[in-house]
């Protein structure tokens, strides 16, 4: 099947983020019937491929990235020379996410009749900072007045078996640094010190693992997760001058940045502290009755005979940028059991079925 050959070619590009290593040029040539726009920002290369099939109808986009994380040591094969073995293809980016890119490339190549417009949005800046990739392409599309109505981001979403998960949203991400101030001194004279560890100890239980909301059927609770805590100089006779704490909240729409800040301020009332807090991504949800959710759900069940769970689990992805521009977006791809791992691999059967899912979606979308 052509999707396997295109996938193998994509895996040969040593496209370690943010370098596409020529992968985007290869894709543009393969899909030469689409109008191509190369969009570069801060050394990041992006590609928009778009084709209008009719003046009426809707605009459906596929999104993905060609960049991969570094391979590291310990592989059984050269991670950029795909190995076909026992029904799997081993390569860096096999699951995350050159399989998804190859699948929608082949699906759109075969479209003859579509009511509306089809676009492909590709970047080499997703695994890194992700600041100058998909976001820049969407800005460009807005300027050209060709923002899509719907989008499918082909990230590896499936858990136990192919077809079991469609992402219909994502939690946001809030990062914070908390500094509890004290006064350094000798442990033998605690009355002359201000020990920030002692002062903060009673407040810690109200932060560590605390749920800021109860969650709902779409989102898990917005939980405070402490990622680092330290104070002192690793000696036993000096009290620390301050206590540093870092935490993250993967927040649902029920809890905002302002809510997190207010809760921390209330918890730290009476302490001498500094709080630095920012939101790196916002939560979003595409409703289950949206056309893109329903159509993709139908195609997944038809091809895989599996009923997918519609969920918002996992970390952030470029899908959040589509949502910021008002695009109804979902995510669907192969299983994710070996993403970013040594000997990353994808099942050939999953790859071929993913192509068939996208092909069926396009054929039955209008």
UniProtKB/Swiss-Prot annotation:
Residue sites binding Zn(2+) 2 per the record: 96, 127, 340
Binding locations of Zn(2+) 1: 65, 96, 155
Residues of the active site: 67, 126
Protein's pathway: Amino-acid biosynthesis; L-lysine biosynthesis via DAP pathway; LL-2,6-diaminopimelate from (S)-tetrahydrodipicolinate (succinylase route): step 3/3
Listed Gene3D superfamilies: 1.10.150.900, 3.30.70.360, Zn peptidases
Superkingdom assignment: Bacteria
PROSITE patterns (UniProt xref): ARGE_DAPE_CPG2_1, ARGE_DAPE_CPG2_2
A GO molecular-function descriptor: acetylornithine deacetylase activity
UniProt keyword Amino-acid biosynthesis present: yes
CDD domains attached to this UniProt entry: M20_DapE_proteobac
Protein name, per record: Succinyl-diaminopimelate desuccinylase
Organism, scientific name: Campylobacter lari (strain RM2100 / D67 / ATCC BAA-1060)
